[in-house]
Amino acid sequence: MAHKKGQGSTQNNRDSIGRRLGVKKFGGEFVRAGNIIIRQRGTATHPGNNVGIGRDHTIFALVDGFVKFERKDKDRKKVSVYPAA
């Protein structure tokens, strides 16, 4: 005889919902001031020209223009927005 009641399989059936992180506007895409370019945890990508960074490391455009992904140095990336000429 069992001393404990068997555990149901529903105990394991949980998962957290996705956080909707990632790139929202890609290279070459036109953005307006205030548009979110990247949602991220930590600074995987750093802010470049005409780009701001929020409390939660969200990168957003400060001016209207085109998104450009660049290298900051050997092992860091940055994203900039360049106004249309």
From Swiss-Prot:
Residues in coiled coil: none
Any GO BP annotation: translation
Example of a GO MF term: structural constituent of ribosome
Cited Gene3D superfamilies: 2.40.50.100
Pfam families according to UniProt: Ribosomal_L27
GO CC, one annotated term: cytosolic large ribosomal subunit
Sequence intervals crossing the membrane: none
Keyword tags: Ribonucleoprotein, Ribosomal protein
Superkingdom classification of source: Bacteria
PANTHER family named among the record's database cross-references: LARGE RIBOSOMAL SUBUNIT PROTEIN BL27M, RIBOSOMAL PROTEIN L27
Family: Belongs to the bacterial ribosomal protein bL27 family.
Name of protein: Large ribosomal subunit protein bL27
Organism: Campylobacter fetus subsp. fetus (strain 82-40)
Name of encoding gene: rpmA
